[in-house]
């Protein structure tokens, strides 16, 4: 057991704990120092106070809130509604990016096509005529059709190949039959069977014409929907590149810019309201101090007047008749001294004048730093609101949405016109055939 704990040292553990504690303390001190530096910044303090005011406004404890212009409020609602509309349209038009959106995968058809494409490679060395026909028909042999038109075109090609194989087999059998007849030994048998051979040739020609007409029907049908499928693929590509891309740009860039500007307006309003509240609080505090100083000066003035009145009455009561003559002789001298010496009333008046001068000497509220910052925040609030209004007016203009919908309808019109032209051409071919 001693071998397992040979490297154990209590001093190492103590040193490690002490080192970790020192690092943690240093990190904490640095964080506090950075926090103190940031808290000394006026903008940082204002940001913290504005966040506090935001919470107070959310809770409904603050009622003095700056109101935004009615035009701004209406544009906000219109912008939000238009953004919802664009997102709703994009949710549907994203379907054009999904291949085969108008023809859901059919498991039975897919397995059948996959089997027909691979069975020749598994069980035989020769490829069928149908596969050769499909390759020569410039037809896309995808595992899953990308559209309903392509599915019909593919089915028509398969039908055409089926009848072509049938026609090919019939011709091969007729050829063998004719060769067997030509190798007949007797001329009499050949002469007797001549009329029967002519009748069989006429019937075969009628059957060949019927098969060829069926082949033409499915070939025309396949070509019609092959062209329709190509037109649809082009329309889908234009929808994705033009319509969807413009909608995504409108949502992800233009409306995002509007949200950023509205956020700036809200932040500047919060800062302005916070600073306005601070300035009002300081004004109220200063007015309270002025009223308190005026009240103290007035009370001191009243007390000083009471003291002077009491002293004069005491002087009038103390002198006797015996001392009237010497006092009358020195009355002039005392009156001169009293005229030169300041009275209690004079001292109180001078103190009040000094206090009023000190109050008047203080810088006015309008010229203080807080009011300068308040004016700056007000200008910032107004400029941000103006910029947001201009941007929202530009984005919410109906011409933008009108242009997008016209673009959508033009793509649809081109595709549907092509569909009509292809179907009319196919019907013209079908009407010209007699089966």
Swiss-Prot record:
Keywords from the UniProt entry: Cytoplasm, Phosphoprotein
InterPro entries to which the protein is assigned, alphabetical: AH/BAR_dom_sf (IPR027267), BAR_dom-cont (IPR018859)
Chief subcellular location: cytoplasm
Compositionally biased region (Basic and acidic residues): 290-304, 322-340, 347-361
Pfam families named among the record's database cross-references: BAR_2 (PF10455)
Superkingdom field: Eukaryota
Region: Disordered, residue numbers: 174-210, 290-372
Record's compositionally biased regions (Acidic residues): 195-210
Subcellular location as annotated: Cytoplasm
Protein's name according to its UniProt entry: Uncharacterized protein YPR148C
Source species: Saccharomyces cerevisiae (strain ATCC 204508 / S288c)
Taxonomic lineage of the native organism: Eukaryota, Fungi, Dikarya, Ascomycota, Saccharomycotina
């Amino acid at each position: 057991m001693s071998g397992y704990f040979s490297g154990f040292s209590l001093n190492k553990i103590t040193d490690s704990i002490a080192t970790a504690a020192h690092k943690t303390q240093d990190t904490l001190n640095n964080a506090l120092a950075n926090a103190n530096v940031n808290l000394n910044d006026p903008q940082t303090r204002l940001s913290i106070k504005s966040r506090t005011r935001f919470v107070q406004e959310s809770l409904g404890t603050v009622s003095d809130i700056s109101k935004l212009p009615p035009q701004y409020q209406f544009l906000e609602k219109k912008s939000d509604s238009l953004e919802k509309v664009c997102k709703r349209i994009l949710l549907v038009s994203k379907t054009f990016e999904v291949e085969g959106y108008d023809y859901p995968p059919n498991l039975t058809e897919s397995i059948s096509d996959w089997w027909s494409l691979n069975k020749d490679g598994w069980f035989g060395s020769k490829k069928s005529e149908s596969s050769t026909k499909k390759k020569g028909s410039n037809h896309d042999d995808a595992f899953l059709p990308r559209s309903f038109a392509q599915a019909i075109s593919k089915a028509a090609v398969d039908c055409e190949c089926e009848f072509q194989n049938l026609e090919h087999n019939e011709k091969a059998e007729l050829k063998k039959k004719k060769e067997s007849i030509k190798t007949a030994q007797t001329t009499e048998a050949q002469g007797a069977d001549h009329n029967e051979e002519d009748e069989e040739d006429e019937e075969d020609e009628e059957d060949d014409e019927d098969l060829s007409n069926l082949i033409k029907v499915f070939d025309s049908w396949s070509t019609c929907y092959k062209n329709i499928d190509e037109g649809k693929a082009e329309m889908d590509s234009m929808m994705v590149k033009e319509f969807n891309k413009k909608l995504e740009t409108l949502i992800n860039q233009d409306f995002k810019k509007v949200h950023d500007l509205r956020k700036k307006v809200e932040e500047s309003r919060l800062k302005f309201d916070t600073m306005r509240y601070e300035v009002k609080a300081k004004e109220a505090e200063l007015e309270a101090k002025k009223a308190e100083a005026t009240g103290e000066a007035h009370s001191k003035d009243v007390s000083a007047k009471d003291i002077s009145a009491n002293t004069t009455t005491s002087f009038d009561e103390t002198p006797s008749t015996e001392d009237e003559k010497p006092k009358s002789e020195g009355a002039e001298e005392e009156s001169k001294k009293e005229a030169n010496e300041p009275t209690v009333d004079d001292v109180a008046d001078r103190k009040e004048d000094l206090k009023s001068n000190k109050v008047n000497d203080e810088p006015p509220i309008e010229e203080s730093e807080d009011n300068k910052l308040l004016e700056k925040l007000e200008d910032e609030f107004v400029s941000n609101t103006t910029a947001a209004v201009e941007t929202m007016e530009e984005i919410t203009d109906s011409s933008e949405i009108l242009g997008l919908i016209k673009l959508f309808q033009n793509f649809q019109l081109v595709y549907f016109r092509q569909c009509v032209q292809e179907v009319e051409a196919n019907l013209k071919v079908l009407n010209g055939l007699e089966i």
